[in-house]
């Protein structure tokens, strides 16, 4: 476990100016894939939380306390995510920023629920992350979990899938759609949401298949899609397998439009897929780096040599929201903090004002389309 635990990443509490006494410290857990194939996303969560804590502490901390961070590496693995969650419990952590993957967030959040902890995910979009608070959800959550204290800063799969379906239909590509997923709660959840949105408008997918995370050879799948003469390949999954799939489509001469969701929002997608990623379509909220509220923070990141793409600023915002909710509660008690979040807001964040509904979802989710294009000497995603 120690190899997955970032002890050195904790921020050291400062000294009170009066008498140079040590300030009381409130430790927040940050969980994500800091190693492994999705480490680029883990770095986004880590850097965002670190910068937010630095700025919050510089402004006086929270209720006289300085914030500190402790990191748990879940390697995008559900079992490891549960281990990280249990480690947080053992360390007395009561608040968590994370996890990244829906498939890790869901089981880890059960540990947090059982131990009265509050968590905010910057990125997990599966609907059951929050919906199960109010009632049964999907195949695995048969009962409501009213004591769940789980929030997110991002939108949901059903919202993202609706945008994708509208585009496919509006562009006249709906007669030959292949929906492919990676069998994870995120990937299959997103694929199913898109498929359902298409079906709600009378469109049936020509193909619907799942692959396994870690697969590298998709030649048989590509051949099958060529035979079906698909015009659009909708991918529910992350950048690793997505990059390999789009590259092998190009290698085999399949010219179908490749489309996916927020799981490929990393320059690693282009590193893996190469020139074949040009023309890929992707759904993600409007680029947070271009928000006026983020201008100064983006400059700080860029000065440090880090590009705050994708979920970096979402992690920053999650930390801001947590700090503001603790302040509103008057103490660092998870239940009292949650009461300041459910149905409450707005919270002033780097993403703009954010409010929550009674489930822990944000009230203003918005997804737009991006196209992967060559900009200068690199291929990256550009908002349409």
Regions found by a protein language model. Give the residues of each.
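Sec/Tat signal peptide C-region and signal peptidase I cleavage site
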Residues: 17-23
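Hydrophobic helical h-region of N-terminal Sec-dependent signal peptides
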Residues: 10-17
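Extracytosolic ligand-binding ectodomains
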Residues: 2-9, 23-384
